[in-house]
């Protein structure tokens, strides 16, 4: 069962409004260097849905994606208590929040809502809504893609666009995902990178591997471009069915 957030609704409103203001401030004050925009632009101009895939550590600037087009975005957010705060923050950017898990629906899970969330996202994509997912969410292993993202791409028949960012001035938290917390220093360097779109055919495992490899490649590139140390993925021995 999902853990409920114990914060008073008024406190939640204050926190999420502050978080949304912080994200907008970052968008306005940082000096963004965007790479791979041609991949993004090609998918946008097609007018069809696709999937933004970004590691959990880089989800903070996800609302920045919507400012570049008028397409609606639907994101998958954990049913855990902290997911409620994130979902309410996304409301400030008119981003649709689907609650659940992107884990492989063919595996047993303790989390409820995963299968229904997957069905909702497939329906969204087929209706032309762009999807946003963290392949290693909600609880890792860090930078190891779960099969659910590739499964969604195949079922919906849409490509996956690997996406990442980093900033020159910020803090990397000691959380499981090593979350990047940018500081809004005016004109500080920030980099946003889009990888090449990935089309998942019948081989879900190959699709999963391709998504993971591409995300780690562009994430390392983004880290190095802003002079930060690359935070590698969790060891393979730590990978498994997280529940």
Name these PLM-found stretches.
Residues 118-152, 156:
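Catalytic-site beta-strand/loop segments enriched in glycine and acidic/polar residues
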Residues 1-66, 72, 88, 95-96, ...:
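Membrane-anchoring hydrophobic helices of lipid-metabolizing enzymes
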């Amino acid at each position: 069962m999902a853990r409920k957030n114990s914060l008073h609704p008024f406190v939640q409103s204050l926190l999420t409004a502050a978080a949304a203001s912080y994200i907008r401030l970052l968008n306005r004050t940082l000096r963004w260097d965007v790479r791979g925009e041609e991949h993004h632009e090609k998918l946008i101009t097609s007018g069809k849905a696709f999937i933004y895939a970004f590691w959990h550590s880089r989800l903070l600037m996800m609302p920045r994606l919507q400012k570049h087009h008028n397409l609606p975005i639907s994101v998958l957010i954990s049913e855990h208590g902290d997911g409620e705060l994130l979902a309410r923050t996304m409301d400030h950017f008119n981003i649709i929040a689907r609650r659940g898990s992107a884990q492989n629906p063919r595996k047993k899970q303790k989390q409820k809502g995963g299968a229904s969330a997957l069905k909702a996202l497939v329906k969204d994509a087929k209706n032309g809504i762009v999807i946003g997912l963290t392949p290693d969410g909600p609880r890792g292993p860090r930078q190891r893609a779960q099969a659910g993202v590739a499964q969604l791409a195949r079922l919906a028949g849409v490509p996956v666009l690997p996406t990442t960012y980093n900033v020159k001035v910020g803090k990397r938290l000691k959380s499981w995902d090593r979350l990047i917390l940018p500081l809004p220093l005016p004109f500080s360097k920030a980099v946003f990178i889009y990888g090449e779109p990935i089309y998942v055919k019948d081989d879900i495992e190959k699709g999963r591997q391709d998504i993971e490899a591409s995300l780690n490649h562009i994430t390392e590139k983004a880290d190095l471009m802003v002079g930060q140390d690359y935070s590698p993925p969790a060891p393979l021995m730590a990978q498994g069915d997280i529940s």
